[in-house]
Every structure is written in structure tokens, then in C-alpha cells.
Design a protein with these regions (language model features):
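Bacterial N-terminal signal peptides that target proteins for export
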Residues: 1-10
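N-terminal signal peptide c-region/cleavage motif recognized by signal peptidases
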Residues: 18-20
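Catalytic-core regions of hydrolytic enzymes
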Residues: 24-153, 168-180
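Active-site-adjacent mobile loop/cap segments within catalytic or ligand-binding domains
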Residues: 31, 42, 106, 160-211
């Protein structure tokens, strides 16, 4: 498991949103979503927990972003608490933000899996992408009445994962464009292996009304 340097992530984020900021008079609003939290630990590796790394990175990045007069930051969580996936989407939508960025850190004993990648909501039948989505979506089983709330969604079903991807099609083009810029910036500013832009069906994105 490897955490991102907050300054590196900040510079990448600035590079990706600078054009949008200059094109509007109001503040550019960024939702920072620290993945997992509370009873949902996320990935673990040699004592490190994804939920803590994601939160620490998001808080550091958010603090620096907040020092800029033309950027407003909204957090889905700013402490170690469990936030349901739909609630994360509701926070983002109510804020009427420009972009939604969810921070996650994977862990794998296979060192060839190292690097950074950016996911957007999309229809895919790629086995590895589906497995990533299934792993992240499995958090819904920690929520009460998730079968009703998510309308019969089965986190272990490829058909369910593919089905929810259709709901985000409106923002797909902008999401892919932003994701490509993120990957390009990481390639220029870090030595991380570029694992590219990928698509999969993530429940946290299904109701998001922004890239």
C-alpha cells in the first residue's frame, strides 16, 4: 500500500481544474471523499489501513486547497466515521460541486500491481475492473437495509455492476477527460507507474451529478 504525497496530489488537482476556475466567476467547488471509514477499514497492509491513509491525505489536500480564494472544499467525512455510499452522493449533490474526487489506496502482495490509476463510472466487462468495483461496492453490506436502499443491487453480480454504470452516462465524457489529465499529471510529477484511466460501476458514483 502506498499513500500519495499531499503536495503531489494537490499539484495534480490544480493542474486539472485551473482552466475551469478561470472560466467562471464563482468559486470552483471540489468534493473530497475519503474512502471507507469507521467500521469499514478498507484495504490493509502491514498495519496500515486504507481508511486512515485516505482521510489523512484528503485533509492535507483540503487544507491547502482551502487557502486558495477561488476554491471551496466540501468533505464527505473529516474524521474516522462510517458514511454510507448514498450519503456521500447526497453531500456532493447538495453542495452543487464542480467535481467529485474519491481517494482510495489499494493493497496487493504482488509488486507488479504498483502504480496509480483513475477510475470513472462506465460500462465494462473487463474482469479486473469488475473485481475492483465489486470489492469497493461490497461496503454496502455494512449498511442497514441495503437491498431495499440500492434497489436489489447485488455487489457480487457483474450484471448489477454493469447496470448502475448506465446512470452516470451524462457525465462520462467530462469524467474521462478529467481522469486523463490526472493520469498525465501524475506521470509528469511522480515515478508511479501509470496504470491508466479505467471504467467500472461504482455505487458511490451512481447518483453523483458531476464529473
Amino acid at each position: 500500500m502506498k499513500s500519495l504525497n499531499s503536495k503531489t496530489f494537490l499539484s495534480v488537482l490544480f493542474l486539472c481544474i485551473s482552466i475551469s476556475i478561470t472560466a467562471q466567476n464563482t468559486k470552483f467547488k471540489v468534493v473530497l471523499d475519503a474512502g471507507h471509514g469507521g467500521k469499514d477499514i478498507g484495504a490493509t497492509y502491514h498495519g496500515y489501513a486504507e481508511k486512515k491513509i485516505a482521510l489523512n491525505t484528503v485533509l492535507k489536500v483540503g487544507k491547502i486547497l482551502e487557502s486558495e480564494h477561488d476554491i471551496e472544499v466540501v468533505y464527505t467525512r473529516n474524521k474516522d466515521v462510517f458514511v454510507e455510499l448514498d450519503d456521500r452522493a447526497n453531500i456532493a449533490n447538495k453542495s452543487k460541486a464542480n467535481i467529485f474526487v474519491s481517494m482510495h489506496c489499494n493493497a496487493n502482495a504482488n509488486t507488479s500491481a504498483a502504480g496509480n490509476e483513475t477510475y470513472v463510472m462506465g460500462i465494462t466487462r473487463n474482469a479486473s475492473n469488475l473485481e475492483v468495483a465489486k470489492k469497493e461496492n461490497s461496503v454496502v453490506t455494512l449498511e442497514d437495509n441495503y437491498e431495499i436502499k440500492y434497489e436489489g443491487f447485488d455487489p457480487n453480480s457483474p450484471e448489477s455492476v454493469i447496470g448502475i454504470s448506465i446512470l452516470q452516462e451524462e457525465y462520462r465524457e467530462l469524467s474521462v477527460e478529467l481522469a486523463a489529465k490526472v493520469q498525465q499529471a501524475f506521470t509528469k510529477k511522480t515515478t508511479f507507474r501509470n496504470r491508466g484511466v479505467k471504467e467500472a460501476g461504482f455505487l458511490v458514483l451512481r447518483k453523483i451529478t458531476m464529473p
